[in-house]
Every structure is written in structure tokens, then in C-alpha cells.
Curated annotation (Swiss-Prot):
The gene is NOP58. It comes from Scheffersomyces stipitis (strain ATCC 58785 / CBS 6054 / NBRC 10063 / NRRL Y-11545) (Yeast). SMART domains: NOSIC. Pfam families: Nop, NOP5NT. This is Nucleolar protein 58. One of its GO terms (biological process) is endonucleolytic cleavage to generate mature 5'-end of SSU-rRNA from (SSU-rRNA, 5.8S rRNA, LSU-rRNA).
Amino acid sequence: MAYVLTETAAGYALLKASDKKIHKSSSLIEDLNTADKVAEQFKIHRFEKFQSAANALEEANAVIEGRVSDSLKKMLEDAKSDKKATLIVSEAKLGNAINKLGLNFSVVSDAASLDLHRAIREFLPELLPGLDDSMLKQMSLGLAHSIGRHKLKFSADKVDTMIVQAIALLDDLDKELNTYAMRCKEWYGWHFPELAKMIVDSVAYARIILTMGVRSNASETDLSEILPEELEEQVKSAAEVSMGTEITAIDLENIRALAEQIVDFAAYREQLSNYLSSRMKAIAPNLTALVGELVGARLIAHAGSLTSLAKAPASTIQILGAEKALFRALKTKHDTPKYGLLYHASLVGQASGKNKGKIARVLAAKAAVALRYDSLAEERDDSGDFGLEVRAKVESRLSALEGRDLRTTSKVVREQPKVDITEARAYNADADAPTAEVDSDDESDTEEIDTKKEKKEKKEKKEKKDKKRKREDDDEEEEDKKSKKEKKEKKEKKEKKEKKEKKDKKDKKSKKEKK
């Protein structure tokens, strides 16, 4: 007796085959090319209808994952007989799961069974009474959409893929902007070299090129929208006595095209930064309040998704982004890194060198809690109050370690202060003055402090050297042990070989003497 288990959008169908060895006969399967032949070969034995669309999705996911659902198990238990029967299934994982149930079925799932299922599905409406072709197609389409939505887990408000792409694009834009700005300054520098020393901001530099053109137009050009009044006068006066060479109209046209690219890229970068900030506040408000938009976005991008990052422990979040250093340290048996991407967080930046590792550990622990709150909480809270509360605790811990009061942040997402474009500072030699005479008591105190520092540094250097020497000695001892072991093994092999050869010679000699 042979049964065929077919999963449809309407329910599970268990078909009984007239030939129990149909799955072994390729000629019989090839003959199933018409509805009459399929109907003649298979009869409906049992049909377990799905209760709703949600139930259909649940059952379909169970089949995809290779699990036997309760309804399928019940149907198979009702269908089993005393005699052992063959059950043909299309999914190998599902077949293995049915085998583990211990039912009286010999489960088959191979290439021939796939061809058999293909023929059955083509003429399925003829086998299932009460289901026409159009209804079955409509059910299949609805189930396909449900499975697609389930796999994508799409939500318009919570798409961390947007963050991953936005932060990657932001990094690429920064690299491109730096490259373009460098080329622009080098190119226009042949015509007006003094301008690069006075204007540090690349976007302002590009806007001056677009507004002014050649340096001879400086006196007639209004740069008040770009530069402060004092700096504008300095640029105009420098243009009159510039040492740069003259450039043609074609040169200026190409330089202007590059300057336009820089201005456009800078405007788009600002727009993208605002977009990333709004996305981070919508998706992970508490993480944003704790570590900031950029660090939070880089953590999510590195982990792949917000859910993956939320599932990670605090120790993983702490060193996320420092995987190369971690594996190198483990390989060489050195100290493992204390922080990865969290190093760029403002709270870690406020800590002194000796406390950075401690604060990174505390921040990682709090970030893990904030991430789980953002990703897995039953009730959404977009205000980020929990993140601000946790940040205050980290700040109090930092102030306790540093032994000084730190400025508390009412707003974590700080607005960037407006940068005044000023002339680059030059060294003023006239401001130099001879050092004042210091009292002997003060000198002795400073000398004592210096000697203590020198002793401490020498002690630390000595300890580091001792540790390094000890590691090298340990490595040498291990190598010596290995070489001795190898020599011993070679010697034993040689002795065994010699003994065997002697034994063989004796045997040959004894055989000759007998003859």
C-alpha cells in the first residue's frame, strides 16, 4: 500500500495509489500526463482542511522548516494501518521528521517522488472535490503573499535595513568628499595658493571658487554670505598680491565643475545625516540616546540587523568592530581589546586612558539592555526616556571613576555648533619670552615628582620586558619539547625497523638451514 502526502494552500491531502510500487517505476510516472490517468492512479484517502489563512501560514512554515504540526500528526495517526505502508513526501526534512514519530510508514523522498508530486499538482483540482482551479490559485496566491511577508518581517516604521545602507553610504560620501576637496585645493592652488592656508573648510573653499572664479575678480566679488567680514578682506588683499600662475577659461570651467560636485555632495551628506538621525530615533531611540546616532547605526550595520544586535551579549557588543585585533590577540596570547566601535561613543571619549576600558564595559552592558528594550519590548516607547536614564547612570559612574564632576547632557543628540571660518593660526615668534626664575623649593618639588614618574615608567617598562622574556622562554621550551618528542619517535621507529630486519634475516637463515 502506498500513500502520497501533498501540501496544498487549502490543506493536507493524503492520496492512495493503486500501484504500491509507483515511486519505483519511472515509466508509470511518465505516463501521468493527463487528468484521467492521474485520477485513475490516485484516489483521495484523507483531506485535512486548514481552518484559516493564519493557520495555513503556520502549517506552510512548519513544512518549510521540516516540522510535523499537530494537525498533520493527527491525520497520519488516523490513516496508519496494521500493515506497513509507503508514504511518499516531497520535502526530505519533513520525511525525516515523520520517520522520528515512529508511525507504521516507510517514508520515501527522492528525485522520482518529486516528479510524482509535480504530476499530481498539475491536475490537483480533479483529485480534490469541491475545489476548482480558480479557487485553488487564489488560495495559493494569498498564502504566497503571507509567506513572503512573514519571511521579510516588513514594517514601514521599523526597517533597520535602511540604517545599514544609510551609514554605509555616509561613510562612502565622507571618503569621496575628502578626495574631491584635496584634488580641488591642489588644482586651484596653482592659481591662488594663499587661499588654502586661509580657508580650512572644504565646502567654503568650493563655494568661493564658484562665486569668485579667477582671483582677479576678488575685489569685485561679494563673499559676505560665505566668509566673515575680516576674513573676506584678507582673502581679497591676498588675491591682489598672489604668487599663483594664470589659468585658462577651460581650466577654470573644469575646476568649477569639481567645486559644484563638492557643494552638492556636502548638501546631500547633510540631508542623509538628518535622515539617518530620524531613522535611528524611530527604530532604536534608547540606543541613540545612549551612544548617539552614528555609533548606534554602525553597531546595527556591523551586526546585520537590530534583532541580531539585541540578541548579542554585552561582551560581544563591547568588542564589536575589533574582531581582527581580538583574534590576533588570542593567536599571540596577548591581552584582548577592550573596545571596538564603542570607542567612538562620547562617554568613552570623556574618560581618561586608564578608565576607558571600564566605561566601555559599563556602556556595553547598558547598551545591551537598551537594545533589547528597543527590539523586543511589547510596548513601543519612542521617547528614549529609558536610554537617557541609563546614560545618566553611566555618567555618574564615569564621574565617580574620574573623581570630577562631568557636564550632564539633557539632550544626547547635540546640535553641531556653527563653525566660524577663521584664518589658520601661524606661530608668533614675538610672543616668546625667557622662562622666569623658579624658587629652589618649587624646583625641588618638581624634581621629586619627575623622579617618581621616571621610576614608575622604568618599573612598568621592566615588567613589560620581563613578561615578554617569559613568553619567549615558554615558547622556546615548548619548541624544545616538541623537537625532543619528534627525535624520540624517530629513534623508536628506527629501532623497530632494525629489529624487524634482524628478525627477517634470522627467519630466512633458518629456512635455508632447514632446506
